[in-house]
Amino acid sequence: MAPAVGIDLGTTYSCVGIFRDDRIEIIANDQGNRTTPSFVAFTDTERLIGDAAKNQVAMNPANTVFDAKRLIGRKFADPEVQADMKHFPFKITDKGGKPVIQVEFKGETKEFTPEEISSMVLTKMRETAEAYLGGTVNNAVVTVPAYFNDSQRQATKDAGLIAGLNVLRIINEPTAAAIAYGLDKKADGERNVLIFDLGGGTFDVSLLTIEEGIFEVKSTAGDTHLGGEDFDNRLVNHFVSEFKRKFKKISPAERARALRRSPTACERAKRTLSSAAQTSIEIDSLYEGIDFYTSITRARFEELCQDLFRSTMEPVERVLRDAKIDKSSVHEIVLVGGSTRIPRIQKLVSDFFNGKEPNKSINPDEAVAYGAAVQAAILSGDTSSKSTNEILLLDVAPLSLGIETAGGVMTPLIKRNTTIPTKKSETFSTFSDNQPGVLIQVFEGERARTKDNNLLGKFELTGIPRARGVPQIEVTFDVDANGIMNVSALEKGTRKTNKIVITNDKGRLSKEEIERMLAEAEKYKAEDEAEASRIRPKNGLESYAYSLRNSLRHSKVDEKLEAGDKEKLKSEIDKTVQWLDENQTATKEEYESQQKELEAVANPIMMKFYAGGEGAPGGFPGAGGPGGFPGGPGAGHASGGGDDGPTVEEVDLKFPMLPLPWQLSVRKMHRPFFLFLLFLIFLIFLILFLFYFFLPVRFNESCFS
């Protein structure tokens, strides 16, 4: 196969590398720089990409495009797009709900999509690689932030196609950086590595375990709109405010012109402050031929960006929480991205991990391209290196995947941050009699109720046994390495089956929706817990009532129960079921009160039945007959025994059966007897012990006296 390259398509800078001769080479561009600005400029005569485009931005700001990565895969109405437009010197228009960049090129007004701008940067990276390798480059692995959604990933892949590249895979930037860190690490045992990737426009945190070439992502978090550009903008706003104080009569047009000329100077000042305590900014002829000159200290810069710096710790906390790993268990913190050179960022990370110093062994600007080059070699079939042959990448599902069960409850089968590929099965049953089929609805999200989550797809399984609780329906979720999910359902008795395939681009969430879901999950956590605690007693009462009703239909019960008792219990069950139908939104306390009322009628009748000495008929607790009193397998549950509850759960598709109060009360009644029996057995053993060890000794002593 032809050589494949790894490309880090960054917000502000891009980088390309290749793995060959058992080593990685980061390829310098025609200016001798190992990173290339992600800038594209349009003039009256030509199109410029990279360093040439950035160098003329002050003279041609309206036609020099940058930060396309902040627009790619987004809608024009996106609040972040709207906020960015205030800082962009070039014009963005709405075309079909998508942002389009408008420039003047060769005397004409042209429109370009973010994908097209990104493809131009990718073309530059491809040409850089071809000039170095002396041949054609067709295959590439392109990186994206871990928190990019499917729309953004697909748009990035489209940019690669426009650039004439066969994109072998889109991989996450922190995962690529982890490869760069771990490729030559041969430490024994499993190591927990946290990748802190703060670049020009995006921020990712990923926690991985690395062991013998296996790179397993445990959890990931981040912000696709936080990076060095935001720090630059704080400096720009600061200097513009200062400029306005000095020149109070400045017009909006002149202010806009000042804004266009200051970003490059502010970026330069920011870089200087990483190694110096103070720097100055000088812009020639900024206003009416007057030069603008001022200085800024590192302390002032840190104060301007303090809230942004501190916000980087929130994803770190979330990653550790999701992975259920204490910060003391993190072996290495790897800093990636140019913005991690800021001393305040390094100090915050170190302080968070109780003084542990971050690992700075890899170049933060090149680490992502380095790892992408390794992955490109693996995917292109390069088997010449032992180090690449031993690498295995395992990524994660960004959101929980599950089905809807009784009461509109979200029942996850695959939790968020589960390693993919993965396969998970659970067994469910039907919730009511004469149910000819079940509707299996697949959802994605973190909320307790399915109405608050995203529906991915649904299908029906028909031709199943009609008796409530009898069918055993095995639902299986199977997610492969490409994120394609197969959901199947099998009724074990009839062997009836059905399935659905859900792909990455079918009904998936946007980045905004993912962020909203996660934010809402935190915000409404208490509300979700309250709702779940309300539904539990509701379903417990419903299951209890229906199980009692089914038990009354059993012939043995019908024979042994007195007609008056049977009618009384039946009437109370009907009353409870009717109340449930009319009070679907009742409180937890009301459901518990109804359960107590039903128990007050049912328990004495149950006790009288047991006192008859007949034992439990089929379907009673511990028996295996059909129908059955609550708790028995005959009620549609697999025998799990005791108070642990059933193993096959009831659903509408399903809701878990709870241990039943009348069962518990019977057991509690016999507890003193069991305790007495245990004491009696202990006493007998004690007497035997004394007889065996002490009486023979006394007998022998009497013989010798």
Curated annotation (Swiss-Prot):
<dbReference type="GO" id="GO:0140662">
    <property type="term" value="F:ATP-dependent protein folding chaperone"/>
</dbReference>
<keyword id="KW-0143">Chaperone</keyword>
<keyword id="KW-0346">Stress response</keyword>
<keyword id="KW-0547">Nucleotide-binding</keyword>
<dbReference type="InterPro" id="IPR013126">
    <property type="entry name" value="Hsp_70_fam"/>
</dbReference>
<dbReference type="InterPro" id="IPR018181">
    <property type="entry name" value="Heat_shock_70_CS"/>
</dbReference>
<dbReference type="InterPro" id="IPR029048">
    <property type="entry name" value="HSP70_C_sf"/>
</dbReference>
<protein>
    <recommendedName>
        <fullName>Heat shock 70 kDa protein</fullName>
    </recommendedName>
</protein>
<dbReference type="GO" id="GO:0009277">
    <property type="term" value="C:fungal-type cell wall"/>
</dbReference>
<keyword id="KW-0067">ATP-binding</keyword>
<feature type="compositionally biased region" description="Gly residues">
    <location>
        <begin position="624"/>
        <end position="644"/>
    </location>
</feature>
<dbReference type="Pfam" id="PF00012">
    <property type="entry name" value="HSP70"/>
</dbReference>
<dbReference type="GO" id="GO:0005524">
    <property type="term" value="F:ATP binding"/>
</dbReference>
<dbReference type="InterPro" id="IPR029047">
    <property type="entry name" value="HSP70_peptide-bd_sf"/>
</dbReference>
<dbReference type="GO" id="GO:0005737">
    <property type="term" value="C:cytoplasm"/>
</dbReference>
<dbReference type="InterPro" id="IPR043129">
    <property type="entry name" value="ATPase_NBD"/>
</dbReference>
<feature type="region of interest" description="Disordered">
    <location>
        <begin position="624"/>
        <end position="645"/>
    </location>
</feature>
<comment type="similarity">
    <text>Belongs to the heat shock protein 70 family.</text>
</comment>
